Amino acid sequence: MGFKANIGIIGAMDDEVREIISHLEDKSVETVSGIDFHTGKLFGKNVVIARCGVGKVFAAICAEAMIIKYSPDLIVNTGVGGAVDKVLRPLDIVFADKLVQHDMDTSAIGDPVGLISGINRVYFETDARAREILVDAAKTLSVNYYVGTVATGDKFISSVADKNRISSTFGAIACEMEGGAIAHTAFVNGTSFIVGRAISDSADGDASMDYPTFLPIAANISTDLTLALIEKY
């Protein structure tokens, strides 16, 4: 029998998973579908961690391979994202209560914007228990956090027009490029999931300047929260 994971961790970039991987005990690595999956133990639990790459297709490939190969009870998508709600500032944390794919649009044939055909859903709800643990961890670490809708799409949002469209159409407070695809994949497989994002940029005209400045710090905050979730879940 292969490695059965209690928790699976997915991040898009090395900065988002490197530190978590370094904490693994009894670690090993296996390549599936072109993605390196790092397995081991954290806080006595079987954990699998992967860097999926940027964008929805890479994220979905990674989540599907992880579920089929390691059967995690919970998938955690950790990393950084852009602020959609103007109240958010760099290094704030957003815990998604639901995910939406903002670039999914078949409204020309009468569907609601964001509808995923075949399963007839616009939003995917995250695991309530995992969300509560993350909120408690944020309070303990004195991190400024928000809970709300996170929007996913295959575009780095860096214009006020895109930001306003995502906010008004979906009620999203943050945006990124993987969470909605991981949520979609987890949903069709019956796997629980949670998505957390540390804000690295303002998703507007300043985004390209904010992002490299705040990325390393934001990724470290996400790592601390993810480790707390693994310990308590």
Predicted segments with their positions:
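His/Asp/Glu-rich mid-to-C-terminal helical/loop segments that flank catalytic regions of hydrolases
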Residues: 203-233
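Proline-aspartate-enriched helix->loop->beta-strand connector
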Residues: 71-76
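Generic non-transmembrane alpha-helical segments
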Residues: 23, 129-144, 185, 221-232
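N-terminal short beta-loop-beta anion/metal-coordinating cradle
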Residues: 2-64, 70
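Alpha-helix C-terminal capping segments
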Residues: 65-69, 87-88, 184-192
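Mid-sequence, gly/pro-rich, charge-dense loop/helix-turn segments that line enzyme active sites
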Residues: 84-170
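A C-terminal functional module that forms or caps the active site or interfaces directly
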Residues: 156-201
